[in-house]
């Protein structure tokens, strides 16, 4: 009997289910799919690079043996992840790629040299993962996302230049590169150039040294869409500012689109020529703020779906509440959690992951009783009232704040927090936390009370140690 790839993999999985622990099977085997079987070679697609490494380094002998037994002959097993064979050195699929050392490429010329490949894969500097479809839009980024999409669809018309600013790790580079990808999908002949300010400066210095300024200017001014990242690093570089000013003018006057990213607005970049500030402000300045709780949860959920990882909602809520400053930190925490589960074989739960994310225990040494005591003190209710089922407004608000701070200051899971408050369901706890998050942004009095409790419990200082 000749087996198809799916049939063979199904038989192998049945055998592995009896040999492996349930956490190992559920984390690494169940999400793995068969991508092909031909000429004695079984190709498996792991859900993420960590799973791929685990399969290759620890589970491959068992998989090969079971596959060979099912086929009645030798079978070679190849494990892939993210459309590429995983090597043992692969650890982080979403790590930022190194800055390209070369000058920005002419995408049309690049495609002519490799006609069989997608434009996304050949344009120097563009990360294939930084596309609009992978960007989670929240209140913090809605305007920037809408402006980026408008620029990608109709460059050189509105919002020229588009200046995207925001703190580290909030998605500026993602949005900027998504513009380039989307533009190439609409118009494969478009000349799209993505460059960091550092690369622009280095190219300029190199061109001066080699007496190649004409080629430098021709290369940058030939772009239909120029994407310039980290423009704040132009501060104090007078000659670079001079050259960029003329490059900007040439493109703008020709109706070409310029998109700029910075960690601050133009007016706050020190030692930046006033005429450049004026040019940057003539279009649209779109600010990206830190994401709120709901957006952080959506980011983790989307990443989990993209990586085909089964994450408990409780763990998603924990990570989203624990890492609040930027998206890169948030995704880094998820990466560490997945790696930890991959290495140890432990299930992806708050209880197993939290100690790894805070190995000193200094960020989470507040007890539930301490939270209840301090909240009742600041909000002028009794601890007994907080733990009761009364719906009096003052008590309900104190109870919600208690749940919120218990999540902030301890490693208790949502069900455990619910148990602390008289057996409340975990969805009730989640709702309470989300309500407090929303109110903190619009209610200064509540924000002050919450901060007072935090100060008494030293929650923030513990996290910084």
Curated annotation (Swiss-Prot):
| SMART domains assigned to the protein according to its UniProt record, in alphabetical order | AAA, Bac_DnaA_C
The compartments listed are: Cytoplasm
Q: Which key words tag this protein in UniProt?
A: ATP-binding, Cytoplasm, DNA replication, DNA-binding, Lipid-binding, Nucleotide-binding
What are the boundaries of the region Domain I, interacts with DnaA modulators? 1-81
Q: Which GO terms describe its biological process?
A: DNA replication initiation; regulation of DNA replication
Which positions in this protein are listed as binding ATP?
A: 169, 171-173
Where are the stretches annotated Disordered? 89-122
- Output the Gene Ontology cellular-component terms: cytoplasm; plasma membrane
Q: Where is this region: Domain IV, binds dsDNA?
A: 342-465
Q: Where is this region: Domain II?
A: 81-124
Region (Domain III, AAA+ region) residue ranges read 125-341
The record's listing under InterPro entries reads: AAA+_ATPase, Chromosome_initiator_DnaA, Chromosome_initiator_DnaA-like, Chromosome_initiator_DnaA_CS, DnaA_C, DnaA_dom, DnaA_N_dom, DnaA_N_sf
Q: Which segments show compositional bias classed as Low complexity? A: 107-117
The record's NCBIfam families line, in alphabetical order, gives: DnaA (TIGR00362)
Quote the entry's note on domains.
Answer: Domain I is involved in oligomerization and binding regulators, domain II is flexibile and of varying length in different bacteria, domain III forms the AAA+ region, while domain IV binds dsDNA.
Protein name (Swiss-Prot/TrEMBL): Chromosomal replication initiator protein DnaA
Task: Say which species the protein is native to.
Answer: Parasynechococcus marenigrum (strain WH8102)
